[in-house]
Swiss-Prot record:
Binds 1 pyridoxal phosphate per subunit. Its cofactor is pyridoxal 5'-phosphate. Signal peptide: none annotated. It catalyses: O-phospho-L-serine + 2-oxoglutarate = 3-phosphooxypyruvate + L-glutamate; 4-(phosphooxy)-L-threonine + 2-oxoglutarate = (R)-3-hydroxy-2-oxo-4-phosphooxybutanoate + L-glutamate. Its main location: cytoplasm. L-glutamate binds at R43. It is an enzyme of class 2 (transferase). Belongs to the class-V pyridoxal-phosphate-dependent aminotransferase family. SerC subfamily. This is Phosphoserine aminotransferase. One of its GO terms (biological process) is pyridoxine biosynthetic process.
Length: 362
């Protein structure tokens, strides 16, 4: 198959074709340097300017105030599960977690290694298909931060509201939803996101952190590579940053502006998700486990009423150029991820295939 396919994978996800073509054209000789972007030193004026431009573009998109730091860190977003409690918890503090899916469960268990974490809600017994009722929780007096995952990539669950914390810093894993919908940065103490959904390719983690959270470092001293304050003071250049990822991210930020900004993409994302859910709800052949009020816009989880047909389904979808529809190994079933770069044409092609498969096998 020579033509581009529709990649419904949860990550790495589709990137806009125009960005890939730009990167291809610039790959051997970036900005007339005679070098590839992969070869240029990270402390050269060109790369320092690239990082500065990327940060400024992200600040404009999200309206990030000056009292927040933007960090471009190498590695998986999962590292933040440990970095957050290490940086934000003092002796005697505790962290409160909403456990609404696999990723928040993992984050809680990582924080609990310090024996300083508790959960406000745990939706695992119900199968991670719903969100806790609004404001039905109580924080301990020694709570240093509240942690939640607005969009659970694996389980397809989305918070329809931002938890109120009474002034306690709110920490959010926005790996699969940052830049897909408008947010108010001032509601958060810290936001982080892996890049491989809506930002760039895998290997970059973006952290947005309020300056107040950098002022009180817990004892003992945090290792330098895991210290937010250290990375902020060095403007993401304490160690070699993932330059190529930042390069693609910078292009993505500018692309988002051409799409009507985050608000424009959010409207499009809502339409894409609504169209797919509407079809899935119209037939008994496909099952959707998540309660309607908690459905994700980015990650639509579903299954077949005849599970033994799943391998056939995936094979035929793959032959049609509909890739990576298999659900996560921890959740099973099927999943269609509709990130920013997924066009409506991809959703239409998927619905057409779903309809045909149901008619032929129902």
């Amino acid at each position: 198959m020579n033509s581009r396919v529709f990649n419904f994978g949860a990550g790495p996800a589709m990137l806009p074709e125009e960005i890939l073509k730009e990167a291809q054209e610039e790959f051997l000789n970036w900005r007339n340097t005679g070098m590839s972007i992969l070869e240029i030193g990270h402390r050269t004026p060109e790369i320092i300017n690239l990082l500065s431009t990327a940060e400024q573009s992200l600040r404009e998109l999200l309206n990030i105030p000056k009292n927040y730091h933007v960090l471009f860190l190498g590695g998986a977003a999962r590292a933040q599960f440990a970095m957050i409690p290490m940086n934000l918890l003092q002796p005697g503090d505790e962290a409160a977690y909403f456990i609404t899916g696999i990723w928040s469960k993992m984050a809680y268990h990582e924080a609990n290694l310090l024996k300083q974490a508790y959960y406000l809600s745990n939706e695992e017994k119900e199968g991670f298909v719903s969100i806790p009722d609004y404001q039905k929780w109580e924080l301990k007096s020694n709570t240093a931060y509240v942690y939640y995952t607005p969009n659970e990539t694996i389980n397809g669950v989305r918070f329809p509201y931002v938890p109120k914390t009474g002034g306690v810093p709110l920490v959010a894993d926005m790996t699969s939803c940052l830049l897909s919908e408008p947010i108010n940065i001032n509601q958060y103490g810290l936001i982080f996101a892996g890049a491989q959904k809506n930002i760039a390719n895998a290997g970059l983690t973006v952290v947005i952190i309020h300056e107040d959270l950098l002022k009180n470092q817990p004892e003992p001293v945090i290792p330098t590579m895991l210290n937010y304050k250290n990375h902020a003071e060095h403007r993401s250049l304490y160690a070699t940053p993932p330059v190529f990822n930042c390069y693609l991210a910078s292009k993505m930020f500018e692309w988002i502006k051409t799409q009507g900004g985050i608000e424009g993409l959010f409207q499009r994302n809502c339409l894409k998700a609504a169209k797919l859910y509407q079809y899935l709800d119209s037939t008994d052949f496909y099952l959707t486990p998540v309660s309607k009020e908690a459905r994700s816009i980015m990650n639509i989880c579903f299954s077949l009423c005849y599970p033994d047909l799943e391998q056939k389904f995936l094979y035929m979808a793959n032959e049609r150029g509909l890739k990576a529809l298999k659900g996560h190994r921890f959740a099973g079933g099927l999943r269609a991820s509709l990130y920013n770069a997924m066009p409506m044409a991809g959703v239409d092609a998927l619905i057409e295939f779903l309809s045909e498969f149901a008619k032929e096998n129902g």
